[in-house]
Amino acid sequence: LAVEVFHNFTLLHDDIMDNADLRRGKETVHKKWNNNVAILSGDAMTILAYKLLVKTDKQFIAPIIDVFNEFSIGVCEGQQYDMDYESMKYVTQEEYTKMIELKTAVLLKGALQIGAIIGEARDSDIHEIGEFGKNIGIAFQLQDDLLDAYGDSTVFGKKQGGDIVANKKTILTIKAFNNAKGSNLEDLHNFYQTTTLDAAIKVPEVIKIFDDTKVKEETELLISNYYMKALESIEKIEVSPSRKEVLSTIAQRIMTRNS
């Protein structure tokens, strides 16, 4: 519960930085009320998360707070990278992967490791369940990038092309810049240098370039690769097959989600 409260705090602040209108199909806190309310609500949720953490059995408090602090700092670092990348002309796939590992994947990794610590798992299993969380978390964010451009906004819960409007460097953008040639590359540069172009024009034009450069297919393959890495980590965990099946099911749901 502490991790979920912390996660929702990050979403409140993330929506402010992205100036997002919708979250899970509903108006964001800063849009419904204002930025100050959203900031203070997020701050309070951080404190509440720690209050929940210390209710754990005393023998586990120190190690789980260490894990919690590590991924909390990572999430903040990842968000800063995300904001920095918006003003950078080029971002490599390696830089982007590092950013989403920090911003998204470390949260899932840490949540699973906290559960393993409380379950008194051996160190090797704590490591492997963390690797599972990291890789499935990266796959989750890559899937999020796809859904932003290609998902149904009524199902996804966000406006289509929000990342495109904000000039965010997603895996689709990075691959498109690598693959595009001629007029497509020139148009892509122009689209990502403006913040004033009407979204109704910009979004479909950029998605057309994504289609022309086959980045959707490349991203789907990349997601599949991280999914397979996650499954490999599950196999290394020394627990009963029925318990592994729970993790496999979670991974499969993430892979097939549309929201």
Model-derived features with residue positions:
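All-alpha prenyltransferase/terpene-synthase fold signal
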Residues: 1-259
